[in-house]
């Protein structure tokens, strides 16, 4: 059908007035063309309780994890289905203090989706994919992605084989990493997890950085984005759910973040995914599960927590051939410095390595307070050369000898010359410890082995023997 010439000329003259209407019509057409919105299944609110409400009439049409919506005078409000029974389903509202009443109409919305786009870099959004940085609306990408996607099939993934430098000497020497690896930073509160994460976020090996700040203090969010990330924010997307937000938003933030990271990975980018912290994600799941009536099974944690943790973390890693990688570095807050609490224990078994931060080292002023003996990278052999592996093994032996004889030396039981290995440990380990010190505002270490070699050679010139002259491998 051809537009009449008179109408065509009129549209050209007043295009500035017609274009917004056409854009609105196109948006509505795309919205209603989605089969999900062709038919709306609805129900009514039956009961309301703290943390959840129940809906009748939807049990046959919804699945666990799907979203529903209801309209109020203040807008449309979302909730997640967390339990389904024959007559009713339980819904946890996304927003705290959501206005809802008995007999309100609730509509099924299906899986929650986001539409990541390249233009999201440099932006800060909430768990729903909405901008919170005051820089205007977000552009929607072509592909709408469910935040509850499954991990890629294991046999379709590339192998993890390419090492990269983090710029943190203690990690690059003792626990080196590879692109596509999943690493956990384990520590108690106030030891320096977020500080170490900020140092790792500055690594040059990544095309994109996606950050999930879960349960963080509100005042720290802007400081982290503006001060810590700085210029690196231009290639980063921050997903934020602060501690005062609802457990549903704190649960959704890491899921939205990994979905955005998957988008960039599928575009061929090497992505760094930072989640701070996985423990608060687990706490949010626990709050939602307990509100739905799920019983706790391990120190107050319901079984669904241990189902959701691997589902989240397994989504990171390498993609299929021709795509990029997601390197996940996540923090785990250990309760009472107990590294065997259920979340820490479960997460340690899922990840490809763990960095342990020691409170006693932080109290001594050694930053980052990484315990090199307790920290492990399961892919270190792919990053070390044979000579580097021998060197690190020797360094760990010296550090272990130094630490296990600390009490003996304090009471005066050490006599130089009686144990050559202990003599070397006493002379060299303090130099090693001093070399590993690194403040967040210091430049990233370009060659950690060269820095260590220089320090040890300086010690040798002062009469101390070298550990190994072949430092670079």
Swiss-Prot record:
Record keywords, A-Z: ATP synthesis, ATP-binding, Bacterial flagellum biogenesis, Bacterial flagellum protein export, Cytoplasm, Hydrogen ion transport, Ion transport, Nucleotide-binding, Protein transport, Translocase, Transport
One Gene Ontology cellular component annotation held by this UniProt entry: bacterial-type flagellum
Catalytic activity from the UniProt record: ATP + H2O + 4 H(+)(in) = ADP + phosphate + 5 H(+)(out)
Species of the source: Agrobacterium fabrum (strain C58 / ATCC 33970) (Agrobacterium tumefaciens (strain C58))
EC number(s) recorded for this UniProt protein: 7.1.2.2
This protein's name: Flagellum-specific ATP synthase
Binding-site positions, ATP: 187-194
One annotated GO molecular function: proton-transporting ATP synthase activity, rotational mechanism
One GO-annotated biological process of the protein: protein secretion by the type III secretion system
Location relative to the cell: Cytoplasm
Listed InterPro entries: AAA+_ATPase, ATPase_a/bsu_AS, ATPase_alpha/beta_chains, ATPase_F1/V1/A1_a/bsu_nucl-bd, ATPase_T3SS_FliI/YscN, FliI_clade3, P-loop_NTPase, T3SS_ATPase_C
Role noted for this protein: Probable catalytic subunit of a protein translocase for flagellum-specific export, or a proton translocase involved in local circuits at the flagellum.
Keyword Repeat: no
Principal location listed in the UniProt entry: cytoplasm
């Amino acid at each position: 059908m051809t537009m009449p010439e008179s109408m065509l000329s009129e549209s050209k003259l007043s295009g500035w007035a017609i274009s917004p209407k056409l854009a609105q019509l196109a948006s509505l057409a795309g919205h209603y063309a989605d089969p999900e919105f062709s038919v709306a299944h609805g129900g009514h609110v039956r009961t309301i309780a703290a943390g959840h409400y129940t809906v009748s009439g939807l049990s046959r049409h919804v699945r666990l994890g799907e979203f529903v919506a209801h309209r109020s005078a203040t807008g449309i409000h979302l909730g997640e289905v967390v339990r389904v029974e024959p007559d009713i389903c339980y819904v946890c509202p996304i927003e705290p203090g959501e206005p809802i009443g008995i007999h309100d109409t609730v509509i099924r919305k299906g899986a929650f989706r986001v539409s990541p786009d390249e233009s999201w870099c440099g932006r800060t959004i909430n768990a729903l994919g909405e901008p919170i940085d005051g820089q205007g609306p977000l552009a929607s990408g072509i592909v709408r992605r469910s935040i509850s996607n499954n991990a890629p099939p294991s046999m379709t993934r590339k192998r993890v084989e390419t090492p990269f430098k983090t710029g943190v000497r203690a990690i690059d020497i003792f626990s080196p990493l590879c692109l596509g690896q999943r690493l956990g930073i384990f520590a108690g509160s106030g030891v320096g997890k977020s500080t170490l994460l900020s140092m790792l976020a500055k690594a040059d090996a990544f095309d994109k950085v996606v950050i999930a700040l879960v349960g963080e203090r509100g005042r720290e969010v802007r400081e982290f984005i503006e001060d810590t990330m700085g210029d690196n924010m231009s290639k980063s997307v921050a997903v934020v759910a602060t501690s005062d937000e609802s457990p549903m938003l704190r649960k959704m933030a890491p899921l939205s973040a990994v979905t955005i990271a998957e988008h960039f990975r599928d575009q061929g980018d090497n992505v760094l995914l930072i989640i701070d912290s996985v423990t608060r994600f687990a706490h949010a799941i626990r709050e939602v599960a307990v509100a739905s009536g799920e019983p706790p099974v391990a120190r107050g944690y319901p079984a669904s927590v241990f189902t959701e943790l691997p589902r989240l973390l397994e989504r990171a890693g390498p993609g299929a051939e021709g795509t990029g990688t997601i390197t996940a570095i996540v923090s785990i807050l250990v309760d009472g410095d107990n590294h065997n609490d259920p979340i820490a224990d479960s997460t340690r078994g899922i990840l490809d390595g763990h960095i342990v931060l020691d409170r006693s080292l932080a109290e001594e002023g050694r930053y980052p307070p990484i315990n090199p003996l307790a920290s492990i990278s399961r892919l270190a052999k792919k990053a070390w050369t044979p000579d580097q592996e021998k060197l690190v093994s020797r360094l760990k032996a010296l550090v272990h000898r130094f630490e296990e004889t600390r009490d003996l030396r304090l009471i005066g039981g050490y006599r130089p010359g009686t144990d050559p290995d202990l003599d070397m440990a006493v002379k060299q380990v303090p130099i090693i410890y001093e070399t590993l010190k690194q403040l967040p505002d210091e430049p990233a270490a370009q060659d950690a082995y060269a820095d260590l070699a220089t320090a040890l050679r300086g010690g040798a010139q002062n009469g101390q023997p070298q550990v190994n002259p072949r430092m670079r491998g």
